[in-house]
Amino acid sequence: MSSPQLTYYDMGAGVLAFSTMRQGGNSMGNYADFNINNYCGDAPEHIARNRQALAALIGVSEQHIVMPHQTHGTVVCRVDAPPAEVLEGVDAVMTDVKGLCIGVSTADCIPILLYDAEHHAACAVHAGWRGTVQRIVQEAVKQMQTAYCSQPCQLKAVIGPGISLESFEVGDEVYQQFADAGFDMDPIARRYAKWHLDLPQCNRIQLEAVGVRDVWMSDICTYQQYEQYFSARRLGINSGRIYTAIVLK
């Protein structure tokens, strides 16, 4: 078995930040090769071996790999120790504890990592279109301010692999939800045969609106690069998930 392949992000010397790719694991079919998500139908024995491989690669114990069960809401959970049970209904996790690997699962939705170097705190955010329209990334920044005294102007943000404007076709009702929520649609929407939305850009705009200036965009479209990164629109819901995570050193 080859080692898991990761896309790394340079967020500073104090952290390890990455997204998993599809290569280098034990899973099969639409989960091939590397999936560690328990909630998408993959074989438990494959997930277990993949988690072991990831833990060994990044230098943490398996118990320190934190992955919530996401429900497209806006709940941000502070994690101070390895959870004793599933983090149910959580779409963002934050910590200031060294050695905890906090992350979110995506397969077209937008993963966002936040890092506060001054207070050595981090957050991982899952922003699908429902979370984006509810401004979950702004809620995450707010929660980091409350928990760790993080200043938005000092945060670093990475917007990881997700579906691009060119590939994210939506119905009129989804477009209207964004318009009704007060978004300026010109920078984030384009009309082809149907409306297309730019979720990465929408989350970047939200971050900048609350004072986060250091935002790095991966510009990886999961739909177009589905051979390297999982895409539910390409592969179906019963397929693997990307794990985008950050570990405080």
List each model region and its residues.
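Active-site microenvironment for binding and transforming phosphate-containing groups
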Residues: M1-K249
